Amino acid sequence: MAKKSAENGIYSVSGDEKKGPLIAPGPDGAPAKGDGPAGLGAPGGCLAVPPRETWTRQMDFIMSCVGFAVGLGNVWRFPYLCYKNGGGVFLIPYVLIALVGGIPIFFLEISLGQFMKAGSINVWNICPLFKGLGYASMVIVFYCNTYYIMVLAWGFYYLVKSFTTTLPWATCGHTWNTPDCVEIFRHEDCANGSLANLTCDQLAERRSPVIEFWENKVLRLSGGLEVPGALNSEVTLCLLACWVLVYFCVWKGVKSTGKIVYFTATFPYVVLVVLLVRGVLLPGALDGIIYYLKPDWSKLRSPQVWIDAGTQIFFSYAIGLGALTALGSYNRFNNNCYKDAIILALINSGTSFFAGFVVFSILGFMATEQGVHISKVAESGPGLAFIAYPRAVTLMPVAPLWAALFFFMLLLLGLDSQFVGVEGFITGLLDLLPASYYFRFQREISVALCCALCFVIDLSMVQMAGMYVFQLFDYYSASGTTLLWQAFWECVAVAWVYGADRFMDDIACMIGYRPCPWMKWCWSFFTPLVCMGIFIFNIVYYKPLVYNKTYVYPWWGEAMGWAFALSSMLCVPLHLLGCLLRAKGTMAERWQHLTQPVWGLHHLEYRAQDADVRGLTTLTPVSESSKVVVVESVM
């Protein structure tokens, strides 16, 4: 069939761009015949494909991005990394990598989604040879959706247990406690014999009720990955409740998601402010904040500091997951995504920095109360959320109130990240379905199947060996290594294959002006260099996963982790090689064909220079001489 090329590629109408009663094109490129007038009805009485949704108001998009990108990592990981890597000095590599890596890629993904009006896979119709990036992001976000919700389930469990007069993790004597359990004490108490005449050396071997509640009651931790054990029925119910909540947040699309995030994205800030006010009034809070910010300039010479800064930026900005492109795809075509990206990046990093004051004011109080150095109580990740902070609130007046506030904030921080991640996955999935496969309740059923599948996989994490499985997912599947790999190839595809100047023109077409040239320079040079540099450092300084500094994973457990990582990382080269091998012609012809963009219907007004093409609408019949052939794939 004859093909008519536009200025920068060939046109393709994606399913969600067909308005009203329109249906997919027939095999000859013309609209397929239907039962309605002029053949425009759906064939055989099939349902019409609805137009792609857009945000009710632009603030819905802003709040959704805040809810997704600002998550648990901002509260429980950044403050610890800042303390561990030289205090205020850590802000130097953090800000530098944000400027040359985080913000440019953050903007790239949002603008790409807005321009292509597609989810994480079809967005790469801009450079079809690199569609493997879309499949890779779908794999990564699926892994994230699977294991991330476990933190919500644990947080929900702690929240329920907080509604008691005495917190269950504050005292010994419960069925899950061992004879080695000793309640919270000051370090000097052991020296003067006020704790049952035990010496400090003897007490060092005893266990806190907070740790025993976490390991023996919540996790019911087994001896290793090879001993899966039974399900924890209480945590399983909490997990099920979380998945039901996520389902009803996502099932109706961005119209419902955009409303829910107004609460889930803003209320955690209210709780953070309340906790900060409470924290700074506690004894020892100032010491904790000083430890958080105290500069250690020698740390700048350590490669690990730069690795930690880079991985934290890419993880907290939610880069490489495909969800940002999905959220951007629901924007109006002329939305100022450049301004939005800058604002969102500042909110993200600002939240991380602010959360450090909240966390370390509490940890400073905790260290003072126990008479130990703050390094003994500083934790990161689940250790902060479920050991350090629960221990701290037991020392406060009205402990259940502060525990309930903290875990409610934790639940909300994770909830919007979770359901927006699921939204990104579902968007990419539904964009793949041809228009002819559309059916009523397609979204609702797809979301239900996704949630059900993830729930079944999550059952492996509520067993006695569940924490070992959780750590495998966390350490390998969505690690800094996989996200840096994604970001590197995104820069290559857009800046070097499609063309950085060309994409800057596309952005100008949307927002009315070209962004700062810094973005183009970053996409072309600085960002890929930073990504590849930190990626290589990650590989060179790789350390096998160890749980709680004691349990070493078996070789097959580590192999499983690397399988998680490689299942996404190999999508890019395998798809690229597969396309080149299947295509026909010389290598130059294959490359030219496979890197030619496939435009959507909404690009006609902006991309086509031919008057016939510019005036084309799907409702207006055209002559054979001026017909534009619509193709669905470049393969």
Swiss-Prot record:
Phosphothreonine: residues carrying this PTM: 617, 620
Sequence ranges on the Extracellular membrane side: 82-87, 160-230, 291-304, 363-394, 466-479, 542-560
InterPro entries named among the record's database cross-references: Na/ntran_symport (IPR000175), Na/ntran_symport_creatine (IPR002984), SNS_sf (IPR037272)
Membrane topology: Multi-pass membrane protein
Gene Ontology molecular function: creatine:sodium symporter activity; gamma-aminobutyric acid:sodium:chloride symporter activity
Location, primary (coarse class): membrane
Phosphoserine modifications at: 623
Listed GO biological process terms: creatine transmembrane transport; neurotransmitter transport
Catalyzed reactions: creatine(out) + chloride(out) + 2 Na(+)(out) = creatine(in) + chloride(in) + 2 Na(+)(in)
TM helices/strands, residue ranges: 61-81, 88-108, 139-159, 231-251, 270-290, 305-325, 342-362, 395-415, 445-465, 480-500, 521-541, 561-581
Compartments in which it is found: Cell membrane; Apical cell membrane
Tissue: Prominent in kidney, heart, and muscle, also present in brain, but not in liver and intestine.
Region (Disordered), start-end ranges: 1-35
GO terms under cellular component: apical plasma membrane
SUPFAM superfamilies found in the cross-reference section: SNF-like
Residues carrying covalently attached carbohydrate according to the record: 192, 197, 548
Post-translational modifications reported in the UniProt record: Glycosylated.
Keywords, comma-separated and alphabetical: Cell membrane, Glycoprotein, Ion transport, Membrane, Phosphoprotein, Sodium, Sodium transport, Symport, Transmembrane, Transmembrane helix, Transport
Domain of life, per lineage: Eukaryota
Topological domain ranges for the Cytoplasmic compartment: 1-60, 109-138, 252-269, 326-341, 416-444, 501-520, 582-635
Feature: compositional bias, Low complexity: 25-35
Pfam families: SNF
Family in the record: Belongs to the sodium:neurotransmitter symporter (SNF) (TC 2.A.22) family. SLC6A8 subfamily.
Biological role stated in the UniProt entry: Creatine:sodium symporter which mediates the uptake of creatine. Plays an important role in supplying creatine to the brain via the blood-brain barrier.
Record's protein name: Sodium- and chloride-dependent creatine transporter 1
Organism: Oryctolagus cuniculus (Rabbit)
Gene giving rise to this polypeptide: SLC6A8
